[in-house]
């Protein structure tokens, strides 16, 4: 009967775990829906802003070509040889139970750091999310300039993105860094996500959509007091929206990974409960049969 007691205890413990994982799955699903809703609602603004920036950049570049000059600004992508000091912002989570989400980000960040070091670049790292910091601190503690809790735990607010942007812009305009990249998980669906390292500063003019030339058409932008001032005003706005979009993608990816992980855990718990219950019933049936056999044998002996 000791075996039956152990099985009852295991079944009860797994049922308790199943309830927890099921509840966590529902919470993650709710947060995922909120993040997706923000993504959908912010898309028109983001697209409109980026289209406007692209049109202005194309027009200014065209005007510079007509005047046989070069469009120069610290906000525009500098030559490769001048990109010496890199800031890597790693967006991970504070909590686990989300499958390979954090480990994939840690591996991508490690690979990028090693790539930059091999190229002779100076690297600084900002870790947002304790899991990301834990993945990097063993080998890169000397280059981690700040480690803080994740900014996407409960939900992303624009002021949080703006605060991070202000910090990065301060380093960039203060000539402390030449390039800023963000390592994060870009959301595709609840079951699919891509870990990427994306350059956010300086603005890479080569990545402008080729369709921007058509969008600009015959439009003529006259900048006052000059083109550079216009760039230095509008690019930071686009940068903040870019970071906000990255944070929302990061949150949606985390919650999608957690929902998927908890769904798998709930299914596994359910399967284990079924197997243990079957085993329990068989042992119980064997025990009852043995007792009946002993009773019948005793009665016949009398």
Residue map of PLM features:
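C-terminal beta-strand-loop-alpha-helix "lid" module of Rossmann-like NAD(P)-dependent dehydrogenases
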Residues: 1-302
């Amino acid at each position: 009967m000791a075996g039956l007691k152990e099985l009852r205890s295991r079944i009860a413990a797994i049922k308790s775990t199943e309830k927890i994982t099921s509840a966590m799955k529902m919470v993650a699903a709710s947060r995922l829906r909120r993040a997706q809703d923000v993504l959908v609602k912010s898309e028109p603004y983001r697209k409109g802003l980026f289209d406007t920036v692209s049109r202005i950049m194309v027009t200014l570049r065209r005007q510079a070509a007509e005047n046989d000059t070069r469009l120069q600004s610290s906000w525009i992508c500098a030559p490769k040889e001048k990109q010496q000091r890199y800031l890597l912002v790693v967006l991970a989570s504070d909590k686990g139970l989300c499958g390979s989400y954090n480990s994939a980000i840690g591996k991508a960040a490690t690979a990028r750091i090693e790539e930059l070091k091999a190229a002779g670049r100076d690297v600084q790292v900002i870790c947002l999310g304790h899991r990301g910091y834990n993945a990097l601190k063993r080998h890169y503690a000397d280059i981690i300039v700040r480690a803080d809790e994740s900014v996407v735990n409960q939900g992303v607010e624009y002021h949080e993105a703006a605060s991070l942007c202000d910090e990065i812009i301060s380093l960039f305009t203060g000539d402390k860094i030449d390039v800023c990249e963000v390592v994060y998980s870009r959301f595709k669906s609840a079951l699919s996500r891509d870990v990427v390292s994306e350059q956010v500063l300086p603005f890479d003019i080569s990545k402008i959509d080729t369709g921007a030339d058509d969008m600009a058409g015959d439009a003529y932008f006259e900048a006052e007091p000059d083109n550079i001032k216009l760039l230095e005003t509008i690019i930071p706005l686009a940068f903040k929206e870019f970071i906000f979009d990255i944070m929302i993608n990061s949150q949606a990816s985390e919650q999608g990974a957690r929902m998927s992980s908890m769904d798998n855990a709930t299914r596994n718990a359910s399967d284990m409960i079924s197997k243990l219950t079957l085993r329990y019933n068989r042992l119980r049936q064997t025990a009852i049969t043995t007792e009946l056999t002993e009773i019948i044998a005793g009665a016949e002996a009398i």
